[in-house]
C-alpha cells in the first residue's frame, strides 16, 4: 500500500470527453502518472426533452470500465469524480450516475456550474504563471465557464449554457462551414454573454487564460504554423476564414489541427470569437491546468503559491541537485546586465523573468554529464513538466541553455516563438556573459562591471588591470568575443 498512498485521482465526466488524471504527490507538487481521455460526446445524446439516450450512456459506462481498473490501486478518500453540464441537465442523470458509481466503486458528484468554475480557477491558479489578476475562460462541451480572480481568490464566477458540442448540434448540424452558420453561432454566443459582460469588466483582469480543448487546439495550430502562442482576435478571424474556405466539416484541414479535435473546432472557435469581441480581450494564453488539477490540488490542501514559476524552479533545482548558490550568482550578474541595457534594447519585464529562469537552471545538464552539458540541459528543460511556463517559454529556455557556451546556433534562437528572434539573441548574449563572470563560484571574485548597449554593440568595462591579473579570464573573454562576432554580435571589452 505504501507506494499507492501518495496517489490521487481526479475524474471529470464532461459533456464532450471523460478525463482521468492520476498523480503522485512529490514535495508539495504533483507528478502526473496517467492521463486518459475518451471522447464520449455525452451532450450529443441529449434529446429535446433533455433525456440521455441509452447509446450515449453506454458509451460513458464503457469508458468508466477502463478508468475503474486504474482506480483499484488508489485509496477511495484520494479519488474525486465530478460530473458537469450534461449530467446537470439530463432528466435521467440519476440512472447514469447509479451505474457509474457501481462501476467505479466510489461516489460521483454532480457539481453546479459555479462550483465547476471555482475548481477550474483553482486549477489555473496552481499551474499557470503570469499576472495575478486574471480572467479564466473554459469552453466545455455543454457549458462555458468565465471566472475573474486575484491570486487564489475568485471575484466573479459564471457558468453559461453554451458549449462546443451543443453549438455544433445547433448551428453546424448540416456540417456546413459557411459564413452564415458562423454568424448565427457567434450572434447567439454574444447574446448569452451580454448579461454578464459588465460584471466581468467591472472586476477586470491583467491577463486572460484559456483552459479548454478549443484553446489547446488553437495553441497546437499556432505552434505548428510557427506563430507566437498568444491567441488574438485577428488570428481567430484568420482561422475562421480558413475553415470557411474548407467548406464542410468533414473537409476541415488546418495545419496542426488533429482529427480528434476537428469536429468541435468550428463551434468552439465561434464561441471564442464571441467572447473576445464581447469582452474586448486583447490576447489569451493557454492555462497549465483546469478542472482536474483543481480537484487534485483541493484534495492535497496545498496553498496557491504567489509565484508558480519560482516553485517549479525550486523543485527542479532540488531534484537535479543544482548548485543553488551558483545559480543565484549567475542570475544576479545577468539581472545587473539586463537592467543596464533594457532601455536601449526596449526589453520587457517577462524577458527579464525568462533570463533569470534560464540562469536558475543553466547547470542542469551537469546532472547527466559535463560533456555536452548544454545539449543535456536543453533536452531536460524541453521535456520536463514546468508548471507556470507556457510551451513556447519552455522552448525558449531550452534554446538559451543550448547556447549558453560554445559557438552560437543562431537558427535555434530564431525557431522559438516566445519572444522576437532579436530579443532571444539579446538574452542569450547576457546569459553567456553572466556565466563567464560568475564562473569562479565566489561572490567576492565577480568584478564590478558596466555594460552599455548601442544598437547591437555591447561595450563591457572591467576594473582597471582586471584583464592583466586574470590571464585565463582574458582568454575566455577573447574566445567569447570571437564566437559572438561569428553571428554578428559586436562585443568590446575594456
UniProtKB/Swiss-Prot annotation:
InterPro entries: ATPase_NBD, GppA/Ppx_hydrolase, Guo-5TP_3DP_PyrP, Ppx_GppA_C, Ppx_GppA_N, PyroPPase_GppA_Ppx. This is Guanosine-5'-triphosphate,3'-diphosphate pyrophosphatase. Belongs to the GppA/Ppx family. GppA subfamily. Pathway: Purine metabolism; ppGpp biosynthesis; ppGpp from GTP: step 2/2. The keyword Cell membrane does not apply. The keyword Hydrolase applies. Keywords: Hydrolase. It comes from Shigella dysenteriae serotype 1 (strain Sd197). The lineage of its organism: Bacteria, Pseudomonadati, Pseudomonadota, Gammaproteobacteria, Enterobacterales. GO terms for molecular function: guanosine-5'-triphosphate,3'-diphosphate diphosphatase activity. GO terms for biological process: guanosine pentaphosphate catabolic process; guanosine tetraphosphate biosynthetic process; nucleobase-containing small molecule interconversion.
Amino acid at each position: 500500500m505504501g507506494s499507492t498512498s501518495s496517489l490521487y485521482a481526479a475524474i471529470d465526466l464532461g459533456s464532450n470527453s471523460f478525463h482521468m488524471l492520476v498523480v503522485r504527490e512529490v514535495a508539495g507538487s504533483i507528478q502526473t502518472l496517467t492521463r486518459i481521455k475518451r471522447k464520449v460526446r455525452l451532450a450529443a445524446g441529449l434529446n429535446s426533452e433533455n433525456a440521455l439516450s441509452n447509446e450515449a450512456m453506454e458509451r460513458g459506462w464503457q469508458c468508466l470500465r477502463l478508468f475503474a481498473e486504474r482506480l483499484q490501486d488508489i485509496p477511495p478518500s484520494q479519488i474525486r469524480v465530478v460530473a458537469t453540464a450534461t449530467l446537470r441537465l439530463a432528466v435521467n442523470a440519476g440512472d447514469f450516475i447509479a451505474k457509474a458509481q457501481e462501476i467505479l466503486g466510489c461516489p460521483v458528484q454532480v457539481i453546479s456550474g459555479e462550483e465547476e468554475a471555482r475548481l477550474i480557477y483553482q486549477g489555473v491558479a496552481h499551474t499557470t504563471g503570469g499576472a495575478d489578476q486574471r480572467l479564466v475562460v473554459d469552453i466545455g462541451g455543454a457549458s462555458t465557464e468565465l471566472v475573474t480572480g486575484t491570486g487564489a481568490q475568485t471575484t466573479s464566477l459564471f457558468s453559461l449554457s453554451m458549449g462546443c458540442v451543443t453549438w455544433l448540434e445547433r448551428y453546424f448540424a448540416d456540417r456546413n462551414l459557411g459564413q452564415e452558420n458562423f454568424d448565427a453561432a457567434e450572434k447567439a454566443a454574444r447574446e448569452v454573454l451580454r448579461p454578464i459582460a459588465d460584471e466581468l469588466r467591472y472586476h477586470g483582469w491583467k491577463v486572460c487564460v484559456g483552459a479548454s480543448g478549443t484553446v489547446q487546439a488553437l495553441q497546437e495550430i499556432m505552434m505548428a504554423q510557427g506563430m507566437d502562442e498568444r491567441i488574438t482576435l485577428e488570428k481567430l478571424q484568420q482561422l475562421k476564414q480558413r475553415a470557411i474556405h474548407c467548406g464542410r466539416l468533414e473537409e476541415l484541414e488546418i495545419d496542426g489541427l488533429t482529427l480528434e479535435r476537428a469536429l468541435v473546432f468550428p463551434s468552439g472557435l465561434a464561441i471564442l470569437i464571441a467572447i473576445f469581441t464581447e469582452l474586448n480581450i486583447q490576447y489569451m494564453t493557454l492555462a497549465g491546468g483546469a478542472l482536474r488539477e483543481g480537484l487534485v490540488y483541493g484534495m492535497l490542501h496545498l496553498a496557491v503559491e504567489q509565484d508558480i514559476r519560482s516553485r517549479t524552479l525550486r523543485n527542479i533545482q532540488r531534484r537535479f541537485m543544482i548548485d543553488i548558490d551558483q545559480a543565484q550568482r549567475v542570475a544576479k550578474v545577468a539581472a545587473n546586465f539586463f537592467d543596464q541595457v533594457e532601455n536601449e534594447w526596449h526589453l520587457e519585464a517577462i524577458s527579464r523573468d525568462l533570463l533569470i529562469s534560464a540562469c536558475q537552471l543553466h547547470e542542469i545538464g551537469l546532472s547527466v554529464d559535463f560533456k555536452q552539458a548544454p545539449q543535456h540541459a536543453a533536452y531536460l528543460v524541453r521535456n520536463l513538466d514546468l508548471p507556470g511556463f507556457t510551451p513556447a517559454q519552455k522552448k525558449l529556455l531550452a534554446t538559451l541553455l543550448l547556447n549558453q557556451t560554445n559557438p552560437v546556433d543562431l537558427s535555434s534562437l530564431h525557431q522559438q516563438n516566445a519572444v522576437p528572434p532579436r530579443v532571444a539573441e539579446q538574452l542569450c548574449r547576457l546569459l553567456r556573459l553572466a556565466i563567464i563572470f560568475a564562473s569562479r563560484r565566489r561572490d567576492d571574485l565577480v568584478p564590478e562591471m558596466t555594460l552599455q548597449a548601442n544598437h547591437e554593440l555591447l561595450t563591457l568595462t572591467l576594473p582597471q588591470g582586471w584583464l592583466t591579473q586574470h590571464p585565463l579570464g582574458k582568454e575566455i573573454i577573447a574566445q567569447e568575443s570571437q564566437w559572438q562576432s561569428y553571428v554578428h554580435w559586436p562585443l568590446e571589452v575594456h
